[in-house]
Amino acid sequence: MSRDGGDVIETAVKSLGKGFDLTADFRLKYCKDGDGSAGDDRLVVLDQTQNRELHIPGFGVFQNVSADINCDKGERTRFRSDILDFNKMSEYFNQRSSVTGKIPSGNFNATFGFQSGSWATDAANVKSLGLDASVVTLFNLHIHNPNRLRLTDRVRNAVPSSWDPQLLARFIERYGTHVITGVSVGGQDVVVVRQDKSSDLDNDLLRHHLYDLGDQLFTGSCLLSTRRLNKAYHHSHSQPKFPEAFNVFDDKQTVAFNNFSINSQNGITVICAKRGGDGRAKSHSEWLITVPDKPDAINFNFIPITSLLKDVPGSGLLSHAMSLYLRYKPPLMDLQYFLDFSGPRAWAPVHNDLPFGAAPNMASAYPALHINFMGPKLYVNTTPVTSEKNPVTGMRFFLEGKKCNRLAIHLQHLDNTRTTVGEKITDEHIWRGSDQITDNDRYFEPLNGKKFSHVCTVPVKYDPNWIKTTSNHKSQNDVAFIVTGAQLEVKKHGSKSVLHLRLRYTKVSDHYVVQNSWVHGPIGTSQKSGIFSSMSMPLTSGSVHHNMIQKDKNEVVLDSGVFPGGPPVPANNKIVKFVDLSQLCRGPQHSPGHWLVTGVRLYLDKGKLCLHVKFALLHRQRLLVSS
């Protein structure tokens, strides 16, 4: 047995009973014990009173091993999956590790090359997945009867008894989400295929090409000549065109690393990867010989930490936090902010606040925008809408009234201020409108010709001078301003009636902005309606195409609301074609999941009135970290 093999086995034995973050790839180096200085500390109590010698087939005897740890001899297998959809393949991977459900694990994402971090995004883009693997399991280590395990007192005492995002995030970072109860050691040679929605290759052909490639890789046949023969056969027999992604032997097409290669062509991606053994081996048969000398952990089995916390105060809150973390996978450094924003959200005004009964005289109660000579007027609700002091996480236009001809602006916000950010939101509010911005008249754009009403498209953002006047000699990074209210106004500028936007800003102390992103709706292919709209577009917003809110019929919706895409609108309403009613919201599914609104602008896209919303991430200044 090589020294490397002995080290891996010793690490594998010590990993049993440790914590693990299921969002990570299944590697021994990612095991968690809660304390980096104590490398052999476990999260669960194992019987150490009757330690014994553990015989591992092919590797000899290991001393002083808990009697709760057993070892079984492994085997060499060839596994071929069917061509499955995203959720079924994810569920299969979870079953291999004794994990319930279909939420993708880090191992699943690493195997198929998913890097977006968004379950909904990946599932929406993928048509099908397949796998062909040659697996050499040298032995299996496992804890006897894992369902009777008990967490150590230090882990039980670390469970927060209340909803404290900082403490909950610290627990997950230190201990992970699951406890390792089994480790399989050996090597695996895997080829996987990922088919995107853009590919029209049917499942039977995809399966045929996958299995054919697996045979060539794992049987030791002459790979290059066989591949050329198959391509010639397809051409000569008028078969469907051979998918170039499966030509993994062409160095010009394939990107290769140590134990990993990837080839992506025409919506099909083929990934070949080895774990364990010598990655420099030229063939599969040569690689097999090296597995006993260089083994690695190829699969883990787990039990959820929360299943061992049934009698611990706060276990339900921790379970909820872990469920959110596994579902949306925010970065660990943002986890406490993500949990801070994970509470319920509401719209202002709520539907109960909208007027019912006999409507007032529109002409006298509300100003109107004239769109054309013969068409209907678009009345404007100029009542200010506020979220009190709750951070705003989204906006939309809404058509009120019996005839749906009264334009209003609605705000989505967190439903309470009992958050880390909420504790620092002050009572200092400042209103700022597009009419207050210098040279705002340069951004007047007509709704439907110069003779009709106009829209002021200048972006409304906080004034940097506010920080200088309110910081009280502190660092300017100690103060941020967020949107907590909005109002539409119609003002006369000479003979023009112009629609303006006002925003209410609220001061947040001890916080600073770390990232900004402008988001707009899916109207058209261009968001610029004129030269002034182009001039007012933020240069720091990045690629506008990537920040569009897409309405894809294949999108995986994780929102359980009755109308997650917004309330229904009468299909035949004549006003709808002039107003974009998209909901511009960012929630937990938009990594890292704690966006809030800091700016808005009105703009026109092909004659349609739209919103363009600036979202930002806030971090707390001088965040205290307890020991």
UniProtKB/Swiss-Prot annotation:
SMART domains, per database record: MACPF (SM00457)
UniProt entry tagged with the keyword Nucleus: no
Recorded superkingdom: Eukaryota
GO biological process, one term: regulation of salicylic acid mediated signaling pathway
Signal peptide (from-to): none
The keyword Transmembrane helix belongs to this UniProt entry's keyword annotation: no
Domain MACPF stretches: 1-339
Keywords annotated in UniProt: Hypersensitive response, Immunity, Innate immunity, Plant defense
Annotated function: Negatively controls the salicylic acid (SA)-mediated pathway of programmed cell death in plant immunity.
PANTHER family, per database record: MACPF DOMAIN-CONTAINING PROTEIN CAD1 (PTHR33199), OS02G0736300 PROTEIN (PTHR33199:SF4)
Assigned protein family: Belongs to the complement C6/C7/C8/C9 (TC 1.C.39) family.
Protein name: MACPF domain-containing protein At1g14780
Provenance organism: Arabidopsis thaliana
Lineage, broadest ranks: Eukaryota, Viridiplantae, Streptophyta, Embryophyta, Tracheophyta
